[in-house]
């Protein structure tokens, strides 16, 4: 039985709640001592993990819709992507304001360059910003064939973000490894498309070098 448009609308409502409830919990935890001994790090890791969860969920939609024969599920992909960007922005903001502090924001650029794991993080955020900004149907029509080329960069984020997470923790625990493993699995489901993209980029680079 296929999902109806009305059911997908209710599913979107549930996904909005899934994006909002972690924020409400975080606010409660901050005000009621629900965080650990290092609340700043806890906030950073919580916001980053939540962004990663929405990224993985967005990547899951296409294969799930295909294998379950539920084409209307695709309509939830943009929503998941926007929540991923929202949480990634909270993640970046928590680092800038809580780790560096308002008086040291001038150091942010230096930090992003000199710390490789932060470099990977900011590259991922910039890509997500571009994808969020161009996620509307009007931008899709305006960009034409370039729209899909741009949104293929989500696969780069799926590589960089788990590495950023693994690199940022001082002690490797199962959690970042699980996220990395899930990202690898979701990318493996698209190996034909990724191989095609790689061959196309390699061909374009070869043609430019030959000029």
Curated annotation (Swiss-Prot):
It comes from the Bacteria. The lineage of its organism: Bacteria, Pseudomonadati, Pseudomonadota, Gammaproteobacteria, Enterobacterales. One of its GO terms (molecular function) is oxidoreductase activity, acting on diphenols and related substances as donors. Its main location: membrane. Belongs to the MsrQ family. Its cofactor is FMN; heme b. The keyword Lipid biosynthesis does not apply. Heterodimer of a catalytic subunit (MsrP) and a heme-binding subunit (MsrQ). Binds 1 FMN per subunit. Disulfide bonds: none annotated. Pfam families: Ferric_reduct. This is Protein-methionine-sulfoxide reductase heme-binding subunit MsrQ. InterPro entries: Fe3_Rdtase_TM_dom, MsrQ-like. The keyword Acyltransferase does not apply. The chain crosses the membrane at residues 10-30, 54-74, 82-102, 116-136, 153-173, 178-198. Part of the MsrPQ system that repairs oxidized periplasmic proteins containing methionine sulfoxide residues (Met-O), using respiratory chain electrons. Thus protects these proteins from oxidative-stress damage caused by reactive species of oxygen and chlorine generated by the host defense mechanisms. MsrPQ is essential for the maintenance of envelope integrity under bleach stress, rescuing a wide series of structurally unrelated periplasmic proteins from methionine oxidation, including the primary periplasmic chaperone SurA and the lipoprotein Pal. Keywords: Cell inner membrane, Cell membrane, Electron transport, Flavoprotein, FMN, Heme, Iron, Membrane, Metal-binding, Transmembrane, Transmembrane helix, Transport. One of its GO terms (biological process) is protein repair. NCBIfam families: PRK05419.1-1 (NF003830), PRK05419.1-2 (NF003831), PRK05419.1-4 (NF003832). It is a multi-pass membrane protein. GO terms for cellular component: plasma membrane. PANTHER family: PROTEIN-METHIONINE-SULFOXIDE REDUCTASE HEME-BINDING SUBUNIT MSRQ.
């Amino acid at each position: 039985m296929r999902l109806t448009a009305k059911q997908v609308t209710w599913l979107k409502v549930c996904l909005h709640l899934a994006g909002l409830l972690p924020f409400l919990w975080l606010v409660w935890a901050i005000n009621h001592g629900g965080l650990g001994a290092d609340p700043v790090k806890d906030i950073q890791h919580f916001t980053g993990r939540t962004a990663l969860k929405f990224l993985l969920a967005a990547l899951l939609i296409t294969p799930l819709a295909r294998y379950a024969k539920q084409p209307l599920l695709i309509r939830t992909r943009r929503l998941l992507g926007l929540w991923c960007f929202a949480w990634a922005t909270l993640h970046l903001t928590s680092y800038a304001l809580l780790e560096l502090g308002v008086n040291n924001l001038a150091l942010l650029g230096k930090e992003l360059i000199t710390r490789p794991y932060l470099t990977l993080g900011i590259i991922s955020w910039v890509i997500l910003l571009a994808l969020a900004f161009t996620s509307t149907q009007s931008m899709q029509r305006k960009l034409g064939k370039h729209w899909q080329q741009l949104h293929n960069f989500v696969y780069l984020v799926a590589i960089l973000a788990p590495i950023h997470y693994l690199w940022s923790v001082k002690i490797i625990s199962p959690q970042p490894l699980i996220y990395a493993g899930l990202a690898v699995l979701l990318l493996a489901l698209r190996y034909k498309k990724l191989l095609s993209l790689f061959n196309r980029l390699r061909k374009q680079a070869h043609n430019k070098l030959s000029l």
